[in-house]
UniProtKB/Swiss-Prot annotation:
Pathway: Alkene biosynthesis; ethylene biosynthesis via S-adenosyl-L-methionine; ethylene from S-adenosyl-L-methionine: step 1/2. The keyword Transport does not apply. The stability of ACS proteins, and the regulation of such stability, play a central role in ethylene biosynthesis. The keyword Lyase applies. One of its GO terms (biological process) is fruit ripening. The modification N6-(pyridoxal phosphate)lysine is found at residue 272. It comes from Arabidopsis thaliana. It catalyses: S-adenosyl-L-methionine = 1-aminocyclopropane-1-carboxylate + S-methyl-5'-thioadenosine + H(+). This is 1-aminocyclopropane-1-carboxylate synthase 9. Pfam families: Aminotran_1_2. It comes from the Eukaryota.
Length: 470
């Protein structure tokens, strides 16, 4: 062990939380309708599998893109050789336009300010390297994505200080919570370099409100720190709401070309909106030239392959396809989310009202034996091992209130979701029955004790009396 680095031998990787342990249990016993119908159903994976048919149809109609051809001629050799680390110009242009389309074309993105990365994990870590020294801190509102404990801290040496949010207001960010987190960092002698938020929120499945976004911009302005807005779920907003980006707020405040705008950075990827996590396509957007320059150099450690860029530049440049895809994706997500909510309600379980994402923030506080995180983990173990559902406990997301869970709904078929809800309902009903029996037994024992005490008091009082009083 002495021959290995401290980074290797320490447990600072952040992957020993229940979030990752649930995945491990699933992988040991994965559900399969035919091969393993009693296996664990994966509801802890935020994966969008609802619109593969649309992409596959497009690929069938555009064989050149899928076959690495141009005008029918192979360009395999051209793509196989070294390319500019900055990325293919046509892909960065198509990606910028796709990001604009998701935001209703209210804001613009300059392709020259985009840095490509191998997914948002790589993009977020790269920004940490650019903005923070080891030991510096970023403030994150809770609950937050459990992977950030690994992505932001492990290799960079940066620290996370939580902004504690409460269910009393739907876990929205408040000015007092921001100030308290900042003051806590100071007490810990940590230099705060910025705030990082996910918008839409992972794990809440809600967009940040304009009030929250304005508050964040005002806060980082007053403290002279950075704001990272991870917007990888921006294309998953469903319902009547439109996604509101931090870029919208900068425009509303006339800060688009200001010094403040240089401290606002966006992370994006195609993993959630297009359902392509295996393609490893992420991006950083920054108005700071030094950040763009440094991040571009760092991107050599996590490039996006030229073949992937070529295929996706053709896909994203097809405006008819992207328009149809975004509309249909949002419709299907809304239908699937409603199906999950209905299934939960049938089991007597509610969740935070959501309008985005691939998951719901589910309230199971009433199923806890006690209002503790120990009880939450016990419930989680029962759901994983007995009910055979892998869901993510709120404690893994640093939620301050026991009993909340993130439950994903877009990575499975409707039939599998129905089965998952059936299993959960049966578990809740059996738990309720046991509680009724337990309460009935408790009441009988309590009543028996009362009668026993009453009889004892009567006997004592009778024997204490003198003969004439009996």
């Amino acid at each position: 062990m002495k021959q290995l680095s401290r980074k290797v031998t320490s447990n600072a990787h952040g992957q020993d939380s229940s979030y990752f342990l649930g995945w491990e249990e699933y992988e040991k016993n994965p559900y399969d309708e035919i091969k393993n119908p009693n296996g664990i159903i994966q509801m802890g994976l935020a994966e969008n599998q609802l619109c593969f048919d649309l992409i596959e149809t497009w690929l069938a109609k555009n064989p050149d893109a899928a076959g690495l051809k141009k005008d029918g001629q192979s360009i395999f050799k051209e793509l196989a050789l070294f390319q500019d680390y900055h990325g293919l110009p046509e892909f960065k242009k198509a990606l910028a336009e796709f990001m604009e389309e998701i935001r209703g074309n209210r804001v613009t993105f300059d392709p020259s300010k985009i840095v490509l990365a191998a997914g948002s994990t790589s993009a977020n870590e790269t920004l940490m390297f650019c903005l923070a020294e080891p030991g510096d801190a970023f403030l994150l509102p809770t609950p937050y994505y459990p992977g950030f404990d690994r992505d932001l801290k492990w290799r960079t040496g940066a620290e996370i200080v939580p902004i504690h949010c409460s269910s009393s207001n739907g876990f929205q960010i408040t000015e007092s919570a921001l100030q308290q987190a900042y003051q806590q960092a100071q007490k810990l002698d940590l230099k705060v370099k910025g705030v990082l938020v996910t918008n839409p929120s992972n794990p809440l499945g809600t967009m940040l409100t304009r009030r929250e976004l304005n508050l964040l911009v005002d806060f980082i302005t007053s403290k002279n720190i950075h704001l990272i807005s991870d917007e990888i779920y921006s294309g998953t907003v469903f319902g009547f709401e439109q996604f509101v980006s931090v870029m919208d707020v900068l425009k509303d405040k006339n800060l688009e070309n200001s010094e403040v705008s240089k401290r606002v950075h966006i992370v994006y990827s195609l993993s959630k909106d297009l359902g392509l996590p295996g393609f490893r396509v992420g991006a950083i957007y920054s108005n700071d030239e030094m950040v763009v320059s440094a991040a571009t150099k760092m991107s050599s450690f996590g490039l996006v392959s030229s073949q992937t860029q070529y295929l996706l530049s053709a896909l994203l440049s097809d405006k008819k396809f992207t328009s149809t895809y975004l509309d249909e994706n949002q419709k299907r997500l809304k239908i699937r989310q409603k199906k999950l909510v209905s299934g939960l309600e049938a089991a007597g379980i509610t969740c935070l009202k959501s309008n985005a994402g691939l998951f719901c923030w589910v309230d199971m506080r009433h199923l806890l034996d006690t209002n503790t995180f120990e009880a939450e983990l016990e419930l989680w173990k029962k759901i994983v091992y007995d009910v055979k559902l892998n869901i993510s406990p709120g404690s893994s997301c640093h939620c301050t209130e026991p009993g909340w869970f993130r439950v994903c709904f877009a990575n499975m078929s409707e039939d599998t979701l129905d089965l998952a809800m059936k299993r959960l309902k049966e578990y809740v009903e059996s738990t309720d029955s046991r509680r009724v029996i337990s309460k009935s037994s408790h009441d009988r024992i309590k009543s028996l004790r009362k009668r026993t005490v009453s009889n004892w008091v009567f006997r004592v009082s009778w024997t204490d009396r003198v003969p004439d009083e009996r």
